[in-house]
Amino acid sequence: MLKSTLLSLSLVFTFSITYGQNTESATIDLQKARIIIESLDRQFAQHFYNGDSISLYNMYAKGASLENKRGNEILLSWGQQIRNSIRNDTRTIIYTTTSLSTDSEFLVELGTYEFRDSKGNSKYKGKYLVVWKQEDGNWKLYRDMGL
């Protein structure tokens, strides 16, 4: 009787593990995600060019970080960077996604950026890593750091 009960429980457990997982809801189409992220990168660059630190800040998720900054420090940091870009004539940013991956909850973007002056000359280049998180159905910056 005990063997029969244990065997039945193990079969139910095995069946529920094998067939009870819903993998379709956890998948993210990386091709579609890449289009969305590249669009968000362009939007981010446009906000920077326009000097709109509030719109930049609003692209971040709750609990997000920019390097080691959080909350209002992110807003202050972008405000300072915008002022510097106006003084240095480096308001144009070009983002290029080089890699995009997912764990089904987050998108991890690796890329390069280039600051250009008003004549289109390259002034500064670098690399970045961004972790995107969905919040209220929209992808938001969750971790943002230069490499």
Regions found by a protein language model. Name each.
Residues 60, 70, 101, 111-113, ...:
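A mature extracytoplasmic/lumenal domain signature
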Residues 57-91:
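Short solvent-exposed beta->alpha transition segments
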Residues 44, 56-57, 64, 109, ...:
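Hydrophobic pocket/interface hotspot
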